[in-house]
Regions:
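Intrinsic disorder/low-complexity segments
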Residues: 2, 24, 37, 47-50
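Short, surface-exposed secondary-structure edge patches
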Residues: 12-16
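Short, structured coil/loop segments at alpha-helix boundaries
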Residues: 11, 28, 50-52
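SH3-family beta-barrel domains
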Residues: 1-9, 29-33, 59-60
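Intrinsically disordered, low-complexity, charged/polar segments
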Residues: 39-61
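Short aromatic-glycine-enriched beta-strand elements
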Residues: 33-39
């Protein structure tokens, strides 16, 4: 899935991912209680973990 970040995010290595960057979701983890976390990667290869409130997806069927 591809999406766009909805706010600035800092990953675990201190690298800032800016609002509006295009990202791809590589992996989804079920945290329970209807909550999920994803491993995302930017177009420049920066990886970060985030819940899905920080990324907007345009999913088409």
């Amino acid at each position: 899935m591809y999406g766009i970040t909805t706010k600035n995010i800092t990953n675990a290595n201190g690298i800032k991912i800016l609002k509006g960057e295009k990202v791809q979701c590589l992996f989804v983890t079920d945290l329970g209680s209807n909550k999920y976390e994803g491993l995302f990667v930017t177009e420049t290869g920066v990886k970060f973990l985030s819940d899905f409130s920080n990324v907007l997806f345009n999913i088409k069927r």
